[in-house]
Regions:
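Generic hydrophobic, amphipathic alpha-helix propensity
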Residues: 12, 16-25, 41, 62, ...
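Helix-turn-helix
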Residues: 19, 23, 27-61, 65
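Amphipathic alpha-helical packing segments from all-alpha helical-bundle domains
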Residues: 75-76, 102-105, 119-154, 176-183
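Hydrophobic alpha-helical connector segments
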Residues: 65, 79-108, 155, 179, ...
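Amphipathic C-terminal alpha-helical segment
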Residues: 102-105, 109, 115, 119, ...
Length: 261
């Protein structure tokens, strides 16, 4: 029986991880963080329960990676939306609107994410977080910053503060008010990005997030092996010659060669 190639094994592992990320986002959004167990996430993903701990140290780290994925893919989608723009101010407006919309549409996820960042262990350095930092750093650079290493953390802090203010139980601030302050800070025109009046603020919230996770059908096995779940799906760790596939940004640095939160 001929073994699968290393590239096929890596693709299977990548998709297994994608399913876990998607399952974490779905379940925490539906049930809340405390009511969601790692076993629940594994079951929703169709994976062996032991596989979760192979990819992630714990539930908090898994959720942070999942929300960072949701955030960076949301930003990518906003920046690539037609008509595409290379204008730095328009791109900054789209980033601000995308993050504020996440706070509006996914309050349970974003509130738990903010709470997790304040834990003693701090944020999780993962491929999804690195990609998010790269997008924000690139946005700051295209906006015209001459000091990205200083202006990137400020943008991050302002966005986090806006999300926090929008989600404080009992006394949340309105998204248009927060948007106005951020737009004033960056000297953006109200018509840029996606103004609140362009989509009803009390309209339906987006709930289908599956497009942000690459969970396509697994590649077919070779002719001498019956198709089925991969070794990774059964909880079998990779062999010495086929280590876990890493995202291309996992060991990368953000703009300016510095790792970012």
């Amino acid at each position: 029986m001929s073994p699968r190639s290393a590239s096929v094994n890596e693709e299977l592992r990548r998709r297994s991880r994608e399913r876990l990320l998607q399952a974490a986002v779905e379940l925490v959004s539906e049930r809340g963080y405390d009511a969601t167990t790692l076993g629940d996430i594994a079951d929703r993903a169709g994976s062996a329960r032991g596989l979760v701990s192979y990819y992630f140290p714990g539930k908090r780290q898994l959720l942070q990676s999942a929300v960072h994925r949701l955030m960076h893919r949301t930003l990518e989608e906003a920046l690539e939306r037609e008509p595409r723009s290379e204008d730095g101010r328009e791109r900054m407006a789209r980033v601000i609107d995308a993050i504020l919309r996440l706070a509006r549409d996914q309050p349970v996820l974003m509130r738990q994410h903010m709470a997790g960042l304040l834990q003693a262990e701090g944020f999780v350095q993962c491929p999804e977080q690195v990609r998010l930092s790269e997008l924000l750093g690139d946005t700051v650079a295209r906006y015209g910053s001459q000091q990205v290493s200083a202006d990137y953390p400020m943008l991050r802090a302002l966005l986090m503060g806006a999300v926090y203010a929008a989600l404080v139980p009992g006394v949340p601030m309105k998204v248009p008010v927060l948007r106005a302050e951020l737009f004033k800070r960056y000297r953006l025109d109200w018509e840029m990005g996606v103004p609140p009046d362009a989509e009803a603020s009390d309209g339906p919230r987006e709930t289908d997030l599956s497009r942000f996770f690459a969970t396509d059908p697994e590649p077919e096995a070779g002719p001498s092996r019956q198709p089925g779940r991969g070794d990774a799906e059964r909880g079998v760790p990779p062999g010495p010659d086929t280590g876990l596939a890493r995202g291309k940004h996992e060991r990368a640095s953000g703009p300016g060669g510095q790792r970012r939160a």
